[in-house]
Structures are given as C-alpha cells and as structure tokens.
Amino acid sequence: QGEVYRRYDPRIRRMLSFRIADPVSDAERFTRWMNDPRVEYFWEQSGSLEVQIAYLERQLTSKHAFPLIGCFDDRPFSYFEIYWAAEDRIGRHYSWQPFDRGLHLLVGETQWRGAHYVQSWLRGVTHYLLLNEPRTQRTVLEPRIDNQRLFRHLEPAGYRTIKEFDFPHKRSRMVMADRHHFFTEVGL
C-alpha cells in the first residue's frame, strides 16, 4: 500500500507520484472517471459506485496486476493498471519475454490531459515499471486503434508500434518500449 514512485518534473514544474489505489478513498473519484464519456468510450466499464469498488478490490487481489493512482502535486489525475504481460490476455498476441510489463491507463481529470502532461506521466510510469522490476526489459501497451490522441505521444516517450491485432472487444495497436532505448535515448 501507499506511494510507490515520486519525482519532480522540471519541464512542467510538478511533482509526479504514483500510489496504490484504495477502493475506499478512491471509489467516488474512480467511479466519476469510469463514467466520463471519453473514458467510458475506451474502457467500456461504466457503472455504479459498487461496481467500481468491486473492480478495484479485484485488481488489488490479482496475482498478475495492480492498480495505481497517478498524482500531480499530490492531486489524483489518472489510473494505471500494471500487469505481467505473459499472464494477461496480451500474452497470446506476441512473443513475450519473462518480466515484460503491461500498462492500461486513463486520465480522469481533464485539466491534466494536455500534451506536456502526457510526456511527464507516460515517461514517469515507464520509468517506474523499469525501476520496479530490474529484470523487465520491455513495457507494452495495447490501446484501441482509434485512440489517436494517445498514439501521437507514444513515440516521443520511447514506444514503437509492433503490430495491430484484434481482441474480442476491440481492435488494438501493440506498442512497446525497450529498457535500453528508454534509458539511453528517451529518458525522463
């Protein structure tokens, strides 16, 4: 429980941090985020407070994933689901390596959706994934193919397109960041 990552980003003059989601204290905010039309379009997970609490509780007890809340200056703005790619549904769609990490994400607070903020949190969460498990060499995302706002930010943060493929519920684009490339070419 608690905070797992914190660093100051001088480009935006903000403190970025990630903490484990709490199904009690984060429930109302998480429910509001999941019921936001823009978030619901990509996540397809709108529902009542009870539905969202149950979802967060499942994530907290999962053996292959865990939920994080992203904060700027200690104000929550986003939700990240960190998972082991080999144990997730994405593992059937590429040649995974042991310790590959995956990421699902949403930005729930509109004032933090600007391009300059995206580079901060996207590089920050990638940095966290690589620091959290030193054996992790690659991080993967599989956003919906029509999430153009996100795609334009991925390459500057070190992600490259691997392929497009279909899940039962969506057409996705797999993107991947490599540890060596991130630390030598991209950075924070």
Per-region residue spans from a language model:
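Conserved GNAT acetyl-CoA-binding A-motif
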Residues: 131-143
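Conserved N-terminal entry element of GNAT/NAT acetyltransferase domains
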Residues: 1-24, 185-186
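Conserved active-site alpha-helix within GNAT-family acetyltransferase domains
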Residues: 145-163
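Conserved acyl-donor/pantetheine-binding loop and adjacent beta-alpha core of acyl/acetyltransferases
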Residues: 85-113, 117
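Active-site rim helix/loop that mediates acceptor-substrate recognition in acyltransferases
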Residues: 47-67
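Conserved beta-strand in the GNAT
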Residues: 69, 75-85
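Conserved catalytic-core motifs of GNAT/GCN5-like acyltransferases
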Residues: 86, 160-174
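Conserved acetyl-CoA-binding loop-helix of GNAT-fold acetyltransferases
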Residues: 114-130, 152
